[in-house]
Curated annotation (Swiss-Prot):
Gene3D superfamilies: 3.10.450.10. The keyword Lyase does not apply. This is Leukocyte cysteine proteinase inhibitor 2. Coiled coil: none annotated.
């Protein structure tokens, strides 16, 4: 299935950098904190 979900795996450096950029925006919009 193209575009389907994959098994969770540790984030590589590129993925972690993206997550670090969007996390503050997500927290601000949802008024929640994520670890």
């Amino acid at each position: 299935l193209a575009g389907g979900l994959t098994e969770p795996r540790p984030a590589d450096t590129e993925i972690q950098e993206i997550a670090n950029k969007v996390k503050p925006q997500l927290e601000e919009k949802t008024n929640k904190k994520y670890d």
